[in-house]
């Protein structure tokens, strides 16, 4: 966002929407309508609020540009899938969105099957959400399924619960599943992951990571795995792992610590918005990140 927008709105959904609307008004004035709106965030609450506000503002101004949905830098594995399902599912269930992307730090072909599942379940999810909302008791949302695939259950539960948790209609989640294909611990872990993705309750570290592109000059998936393993014993951290300096500094600003590719074989480390170490050899970077985390934790204690 520009300094002008930041000074008036701050880093908020309102600022993101107004920044976008300024360009759309120019497009309308010039009768240029070949536009798709992609307005994303790695925070699902911000992402959902921003897209909703964008849709309302376009309607007020008589615009009807298509909306592209996605949770940017969602990560990888089941956490990346759940976070994407929470954000995208909340909006699809409200009839918003014309195209979607599930942004995963994995091979590109892994994204499409997940996106197809979200689209296929969207209408059913909207109906289930309406029914589930009526059953919320003392802030606890209970969802019941009969799934044999853990991934399918995770995606459906994340879509069904997302908007209700983001909007504060529930503050806890219980997931039930018929049969013995999915164990009770997996159901609890899924509920915890959904609560964290919706920013309701944090039970483990959060990792923000990009899907990688031609600018990424190190093995992103391998590095994410190494950082996750090295920080597994820590709690409550938000770590951004970004492939390059184009999007990296902006994304790490919202994280406690950032690991950003700087050049071939080189990495820079961030503590929030501040770059602490530049151009570290890649083979030393994970250990130096751990040292930075430990030093920061010691200063705060």
Language-model-detected regions and their locations in the chain:
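Catalytic alpha/beta core domains of metabolic enzymes, predominantly
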Residues: 3-234, 238-241
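Short amphipathic alpha-helical patches
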Residues: 50-51, 114-115, 254, 275-282
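Nucleotide-binding motor/catalytic cores of P-loop/tubulin-like NTPases across gene-expression machines
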Residues: 245-251, 255-275
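Beta-strand/loop-dominated core regions that host nucleotide or nucleotide-derived cofactor-binding catalytic loops
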Residues: 264-267, 274-298
């Amino acid at each position: 966002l520009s300094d002008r927008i930041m000074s008036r709105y701050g880093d908020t959904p309102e600022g993101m929407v107004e920044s976008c609307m300024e360009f759309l008004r120019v497009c309308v004035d010039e009768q240029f309508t070949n536009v798709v709106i992609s307005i994303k965030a790695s925070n699902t609450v911000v992402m959902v609020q921003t897209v909703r506000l964008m849709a309302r503002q376009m309607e007020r101004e008589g615009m009807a540009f298509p909306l592209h949905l996605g949770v940017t830098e969602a990560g990888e594995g089941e956490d990346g899938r759940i976070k994407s399902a929470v954000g995208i599912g909340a909006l699809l269930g409200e009839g918003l969105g014309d195209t979607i992307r599930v942004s995963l730090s994995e091979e590109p072909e892994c994204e499409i099957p997940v996106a197809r599942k979200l689209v296929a379940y969207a209408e059913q999810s909207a109906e289930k959400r309406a029914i589930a909302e009526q059953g919320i008791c003392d802030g606890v949302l209970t969802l019941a399924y009969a799934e044999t695939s853990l991934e399918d259950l995770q995606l459906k539960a994340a879509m069904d619960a997302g908007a209700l948790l983001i909007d504060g209609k529930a503050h806890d989640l219980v997931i039930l599943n018929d049969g013995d294909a999915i164990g009770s611990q997996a159901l609890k872990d899924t509920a915890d992951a959904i609560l964290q993705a919706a920013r309701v309750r944090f039970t483990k570290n959060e990792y923000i990571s990009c899907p990688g592109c031609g600018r990424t000059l190190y093995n992103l998936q391998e590095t994410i795995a190494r950082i996750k393993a090295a920080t597994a014993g820590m709690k409550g951290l938000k770590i951004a792992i970004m492939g390059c300096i184009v999007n990296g500094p902006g994304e790490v600003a919202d994280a406690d610590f950032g690991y950003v590719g700087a050049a071939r074989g080189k990495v820079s480390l961030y503590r929030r918005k501040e770059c602490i170490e530049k151009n570290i050899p890649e083979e030393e970077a994970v250990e130096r990140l751990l040292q930075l985390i430990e030093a920061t934790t010691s200063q705060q204690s």
